[in-house]
């Protein structure tokens, strides 16, 4: 039997001696993490309940009916620095721009590092004795690291005063509505929760502030984070449970929630159409 050497990828015929642009050639590099600014003047002890949810659940909290009041916002910033290029060890005997027109000549690069700042802010609302944290998820423009750091900041602040915590979210990896507490998990493998709500539950269950009492309501959905679609039956269950947990008037509250959900087109089948 003859064994012949072969490669998955063909080797190039010509190898160019390109100068090293980066000092660190390893795959793992130390990267910055977002900084979260929590409102300093927020008086958390005066609230007995804290609701943590995402923007897709905003129809559950009608502004006019509940008289929502904006009391601050959570700001998060991420500063990314472009490292300065290393100094060249010698002069080239050829023209750099001619051989590498799309590359940057290290000899002509300034020593100063460029900084790029990414920032997002999310409002905090209140109604009665309840705080409302509503995080906007968008897998296109907002990295998951922002949600992870925001959830850590929120739970660490609430852990100092231990209010009743209610978490409301969605997941496309569950088959039916799930109600969970600190002592009971109704998820059945391979069901799981991701995104901002998954990060919040992680902080409540295994994070530094674990042990807090909470109730969690997760509805099945379709679509990526930030663009979820819910069924009308699941919306009815959400409205009933939220109205029961928060003590809202059933008839008027449910009517307003359904109206807002249809306006936001968050319901599967709320707006029927035909793809052409």
Swiss-Prot record:
GO terms for biological process: proteasome assembly. Its main location: cytoplasm. Keywords: Chaperone, Cytoplasm. The keyword Zinc does not apply. It comes from the Eukaryota. GO terms for cellular component: cytoplasm. The keyword Transmembrane helix does not apply. It is found in: Cytoplasm. Present with 1350 molecules/cell in log phase SD medium. Component of the 20S proteasome chaperone. Forms a heterodimer with ADD66 that binds to proteasome precursors. Involved in 20S proteasome assembly. Belongs to the PSMG1 family. This is Proteasome chaperone 1.
């Amino acid at each position: 039997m003859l064994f012949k050497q072969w490669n998955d990828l063909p080797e190039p015929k010509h190898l160019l001696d390109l100068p090293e642009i980066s000092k660190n050639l390893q795959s793992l590099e130390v990267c910055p993490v977002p900084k979260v600014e929590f409102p300093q003047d927020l008086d958390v002890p005066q609230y007995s309940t804290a609701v943590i949810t995402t923007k897709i659940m905003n129809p559950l909290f009608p502004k006019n009916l509940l008289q929502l009041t904006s009391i601050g916002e959570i700001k998060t910033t991420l500063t990314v620095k472009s490292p300065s290029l290393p100094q060249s060890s010698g002069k080239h005997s050829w023209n750099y721009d001619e051989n590498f027109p799309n590359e940057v000549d290290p000899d002509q690069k300034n020593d100063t590092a460029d900084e790029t700042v990414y920032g997002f802010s999310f409002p905090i609302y209140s109604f009665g004795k309840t705080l409302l944290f509503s995080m906007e998820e968008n897998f296109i423009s907002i990295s998951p690291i922002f949600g992870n750091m925001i959830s850590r900041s929120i739970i660490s602040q609430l852990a100092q005063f231990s209010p009743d915590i209610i978490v409301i979210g969605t997941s496309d990896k569950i088959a039916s509505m799930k109600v969970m507490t600190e002592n009971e998990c109704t998820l059945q493998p391979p069901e799981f929760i991701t995104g901002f709500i998954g990060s919040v539950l992680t902080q409540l269950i295994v994070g530094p502030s674990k042990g807090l009492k909470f109730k969690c309501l997760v509805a099945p959905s379709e679509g990526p984070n930030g663009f979820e679609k819910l069924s009308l039956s699941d919306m009815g269950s959400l409205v009933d449970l939220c109205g029961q947990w928060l003590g809202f008037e059933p008839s008027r509250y449910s009517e307003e929630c359904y109206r807002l959900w249809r306006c936001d087109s968050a319901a599967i089948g709320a707006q029927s159409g035909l793809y052409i």
